[in-house]
């Protein structure tokens, strides 16, 4: 990354406060943005990082179908960021839930974005998207109780996960070697213990983003991409997909590239690769931002 310097990004709008261009970041389901601090470190050498601390836990932006309100939360946060820093546009970076909501924000309000790098968005595409759409419709029938989406999405597992521990130390011991967390770097996992949990009145700790919100996010994953849009966003965007991600195995990025001409590249790791390889992923993001600037 020695070839990348501040001059590499000089054509981007510059914050009147920090004299750097601005990245707006949005996090994965259940992973508050401060957990990503190891990922932010390299980016912060060149950019000011702004983010929504917690998606899915704000009454003004409830978790609803197709993540419409969460998408609006991204748009509103980006508008506020532009106003704060005196810029017309930001660079958007998102992971998972945050990547998908950011993508939808690109379609909704493209004028606020210069470009985007989206990491492993749950962009369910093609015929599978139609299946999810029908499943969500059927789940609204009496007595269905979200039965179909709990099978199709991670909601069925998430709703049964443990969400209370005696202490942060207890949570660390119980979670560190679990499949979902086992490949996190130590700093990323320590960040989750610090920011992904909060203390209850009785001294125990629970999820900072409630389990009910986490489950609701999975059940309402956007499912209209069998129908629309049939064009790429108006601003440059590239996807980064984990080599072991279920989305790559289901060939969603491949379909998106073929249909919408949105490019993707891969990085070692699974769906949570930005927390498994924060330094190399941040370098990849910087390289993509520079590449997309050069292509304009």
Locations of regions flagged by a protein language model:
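Short glycine-rich catalytic loops that host catalytic nucleophiles or stabilize transition states
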Residues: 52, 264-270
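Conserved hydrolase catalytic core segment
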Residues: 89-135
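Catalytic histidine-centered segment of alpha/beta-hydrolase-like enzymes
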Residues: 269-279
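A short loop-to-beta-strand scaffold at the N-terminal edge of the catalytic core in hydrolase folds
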Residues: 2-16
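Conserved serine/cysteine hydrolase catalytic core
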Residues: 186-257
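Flexible "cap/lid" loop of the alpha/beta hydrolase fold
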Residues: 116-164, 249
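Active-site loop/oxyanion-hole signature of alpha/beta-hydrolase fold enzymes
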Residues: 50, 54-93, 132-135
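Conserved HGGG/HGGXW glycine-rich cap/lid loop of the alpha/beta-hydrolase fold
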Residues: 13-61
């Amino acid at each position: 990354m020695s070839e990348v310097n501040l001059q590499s990004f000089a054509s981007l709008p510059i914050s009147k406060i920090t004299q750097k261009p601005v990245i707006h970041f949005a996090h994965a389901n259940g992973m508050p943005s401060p957990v990503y601090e190891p990922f932010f470190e390299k980016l912060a050498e060149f950019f000011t990082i702004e983010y929504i601390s917690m998606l899915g836990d704000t009454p003004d932006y409830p978790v609803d179908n197709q993540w419409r309100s969460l998408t609006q939360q991204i748009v509103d946060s980006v508008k506020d960021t532009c106003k704060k820093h005196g810029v017309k546009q930001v660079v958007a970076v998102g992971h998972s839930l945050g990547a998908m909501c950011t993508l939808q924000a690109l379609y909704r309000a493209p004028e606020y974005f210069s470009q985007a790098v989206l990491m492993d968005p749950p962009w369910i595409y093609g015929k599978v998207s139609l299946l999810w759409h029908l499943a969500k419709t059927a789940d609204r029938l009496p007595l269905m109780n979200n039965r179909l989406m709990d099978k199709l999405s991670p909601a069925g597992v998430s709703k049964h996960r443990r969400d209370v521990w005696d202490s942060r130390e207890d949570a660390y011991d119980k979670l560190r070697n679990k499949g979902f967390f086992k490949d996190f770097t130590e700093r990323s996992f320590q960040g989750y213990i610090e920011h992904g949990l909060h203390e209850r009145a009785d001294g125990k700790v629970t999820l900072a983003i409630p389990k009910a919100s986490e489950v609701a996010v999975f059940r309402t994953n956007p499912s209209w991409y069998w129908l629309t849009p049939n064009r790429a966003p108006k601003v440059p965007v590239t996807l980064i997909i984990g080599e072991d991600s279920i989305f790559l195995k289901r060939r969603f990025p491949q379909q998106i590239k073929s249909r919408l001409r949105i490019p993707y590249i891969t990085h070692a790791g699974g769906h949570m690769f930005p927390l498994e390889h924060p330094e190399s992923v941040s370098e990849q993001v910087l390289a993509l931002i520079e590449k997309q600037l050069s292509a304009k």
